[in-house]
C-alpha cells in the first residue's frame, strides 16, 4: 500500500471521527452523577462502564462483557544510542521473542489474568529476530533515527505508523474485539514519550522526564538533557500531532495512536496503560479530540509527566500501583474490573436469572430465631442473650500478632527481581506478592490461594446491595458470610463475635476481605466523619477497652466487632483486605495500639484503588482480591531473564541484581 494511501486513510479516519456527534454529549454517565450507572452506585467504576456502554449499545439494552485483546507494539528508537536506558537496544528483539516463544513476560501473565487475547506487532525492531510465526509484521524501518540529532522519522513514516494502527483496529474489530489494551516494547521509548508530553502538555524537560527502566541518578540527568536537546533540535509543532510524532515520537507510539483512532471509528473502547500509551493517546487526541470518549484510564504511572497527560486527556486513574512498565499492565487489571462491574450490573437486572452452582455466588447466613424468613441463605448472627460466661469488658485485649515469614518474603522478592522486566517496575504488585509470601510461608503463593469475604451489618443489606456484593465476590471467587450485630450486646460481646466470625473463616483462608455494610452512601459518609474525628484522639498507650469506650456510642459496637474480626484474622496468619472507611478506621486504630499487625492489613481504597466507594459492602475488598490475583499471575506465570534469554540491566538498581 502506498504512502498516499496511508495519508488518505488517516485523513478519512479523522474526518469520520470528527463528523460523529460526541456520544457523551459532555454529560455525566447516563446523565446522572459520576458515581451512578443505571441507578446503581459504583463510584469510580461508573465512568469506566458508561463509555463502554455508550460505545457498545448506545447505553441501552443488556450490557455484555467485551471480547478483549492485548496488542503489544514493538519498535526500536535511534535515541537509544544516547545511553538513556538501563537496558541495551537488543532487548526490544529479545522481549518480542519472549512474548511469543517463552511467553514469560508480564504482558503474557496479565493478558491471561484479564482473559484477553495477546497479539504482538513489529513496527520497527532493529536487531534480528528468530522465526516468530505469530508475529504481526508491520515493520516500517529498523528503528527510528536519533531524534536528538534530527527528526525521528519522515512524515510519510509517521503517517504509515498511524495507518498501521488504524488497519489493526479495523482487523481486530472485524474479529469481534470491542475492548483494546495497547502496550508497547521499545528501549528508550520513555524518552520519546517525554518529548511528546513536553510538547503537547507544555512541560519542561525536567517535568516531562522520569526514570523509565529505573535508571540511575546520573543517567537520569543525561536523559533530561537529551530530551532538552530533542526539543531544541526539532521544535515540534504542538498544533500538528503528526509533526510531533514525526519529529520526536516512535513507530510503536504512532501505531498505538492509530489504534486509538481506529477504535474510535469502530466504536470500540481503548483502556490506556501507563506513560507511553498516554503519550500515544495525546497524539491521537491532537488529531481527533473526540477519541477521548472512547478512552478508559487505568493507573497513575511512576513517570512524573503521566499525571499531566491524564489531565490533558480528562481522565482520572482508578489506581496508583507505582508501575513503571508499559506492557498493558495496569490496563489488564482495569479490564478485569470492567468485567466485574458488568457482571454486577447484569446481576442487578430484574429479568436476569441468578447464577446457580457457584459457592462464591451465595451469601452464607445463619439466622437467629427472631429473624427467620429472610431471603439470604446463611449468616452468622450475634447471640442476643447475655450468658453467665459471656465475655466481660475487662477481658478485652488484642491477640499477639504473628511474625511474617521473612525467608519466604526474601525468596519471593529475589525471584521477582530476576523476572524479565525492569527491576521494581511492577511496584505495589510486587509488594502484594511478597506480603502474601510472608503470610503463607510460600515463596510462590498459589494462584488458587483460598479466600473469603466477611460482611458485618446491623441489619440485612437491601436486595440490590446484596446482589452487588454477591456479584463482585463471585468474580473474585470469594464465598460471602454476612455477620449481623445485635444492637443490645455489650462491647465485649461484639468483639468476641467479630473475632469468632473471622477466625472461623481464617482457619483455611489466607485471604479475608472484611466490610461493614451501610445502607446508603450518606450513612457511610457520616460514619466515616465520626471515625476520622475519633482517630485523632487515640494514643499508642491506650488499652483496647479505653479506645472502644472513647468512641462515640454510634461507633462502639461496629468498632468492637471489626477490631475483633481484624485482629482475630491477622492472628491466624491471614492477610486482611479492608473494604471501606469503617474497616480501614478500625484497622488504623489497631495499628496505633499494636503496630505489628500492620503487615497483615491491606487498606484497599486508601492505599491501592481510588474507587470512591463509600457504602462499599464488599465491592472494594473483592476488587482487592483480584488485585492480589494479578500479583499471583505475575509471580507464577512470568519467567526469569535466564529462562527467557533477555539481557539484564546495565545501570540503576537492577545492575548486578538481575539474572
Regions found by a protein language model. Name each.
Residues 2-366, 372-383, 387-659:
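N-terminal loops that bind phosphate or other acidic moieties
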